């Protein structure tokens, strides 16, 4: 079984290398994605213009790993959770339904239009936003922090172009697994009931922590993913 990982805003695939170190019983191959970004002036890579383009690129990446031959699952943290969800929705249309889509530190996609305004201007005071989220290396030097901020701002602007649709009958994902921290400043519990609009089956796990709770509880998160895949 294959697991595909989509990172948070400003993040990279290597931020989730701990998945590759864990001894899963039911997952054989793990792939972590890097969003196409123009990281250097001389780079020929072009920045993605909108969220839809990000999803399309992610779909191409997943399809390049031959998912027709065996079951697979998708994992996304924060912004990456929306990417994983949309990738799963699109692949389901083509008969390639993921076993589950694991969404970490994110609201139900269909609720995003209701909270869009809260996200549109987050990058104006990016230092305050980073402080609220937590999980950032306090020892990061100024150059590295400025680089991270530039990526985070770019990704937040891209998130502003995300317009999810409410799935019609037969379009919902078969299964979503939800992980979150109980003190996450960008989650809205009043909309959690809308997970039922996104998937026929949802299982939710909550930890004591903030947006990046996963780094504190990664062993337990991966254990629960393995158990869920097994059906336990």
Model segments located where?
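Flexible "cap/lid" loop of the alpha/beta hydrolase fold
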Residues: 89-127, 164
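Short alpha-helix in the alpha/beta-hydrolase fold that links the catalytic acid
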Residues: 18, 188-197
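Active-site nucleophile elbow and catalytic-triad environment of alpha/beta-hydrolase enzymes
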Residues: 149-168
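Gly/Ala-rich beta-loop-alpha elbow adjacent to hydrolase catalytic centers
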Residues: 76-80, 84
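Catalytic histidine-centered segment of alpha/beta-hydrolase-like enzymes
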Residues: 209-219
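Short beta-strand/loop motif that positions the catalytic acidic residue
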Residues: 178-180
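Active-site catalytic motif of lipid deacylating hydrolases and related acyltransferases
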Residues: 2-70, 107-125, 206-211, 228
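Acidic catalytic loop of the alpha/beta-hydrolase fold
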Residues: 183-187, 211-212
């Amino acid at each position: 079984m294959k697991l595909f990982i989509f990172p948070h805003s400003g993040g990279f695939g290597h931020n989730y290398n701990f998945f590759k170190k864990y001894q899963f019983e039911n997952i054989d191959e793990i792939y972590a994605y890097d969003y196409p970004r123009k990281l250097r002036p001389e780079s020929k890579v072009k920045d993605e213009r909108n969220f839809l383009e990000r999803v399309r690129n992610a779909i191409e990446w997943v399809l390049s790993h031959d998912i027709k031959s065996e079951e697979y699952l998708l994992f996304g943290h924060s912004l990456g959770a929306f990417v994983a969800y949309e990738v799963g929705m699109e692949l389901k249309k083509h008969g390639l339904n993921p076993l589950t889509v694991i969404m970490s530190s994110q609201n139900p996609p269909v609720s995003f239009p209701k909270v869009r305004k809260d996200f549109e201007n987050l990058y104006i005071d990016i230092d305050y936003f980073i402080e609220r989220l937590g999980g950032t290396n306090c020892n990061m030097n100024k150059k590295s922090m400025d680089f991270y901020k530039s990526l985070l701002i770019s990704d937040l602007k891209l998130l502003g172009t995300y317009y999810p649709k409410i799935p019609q009958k037969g379009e919902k994902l078969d299964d979503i697994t939800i992980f979150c921290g109980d003190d996450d400043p960008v989650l809205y519990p009043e909309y959690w009931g809308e997970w039922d609009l996104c998937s026929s089956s949802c299982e939710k796990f909550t930890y004591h922590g903030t947006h990046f709770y996963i780094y504190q509880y990664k062993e337990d998160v991966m254990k629960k993913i393995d158990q869920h895949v097994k059906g336990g």
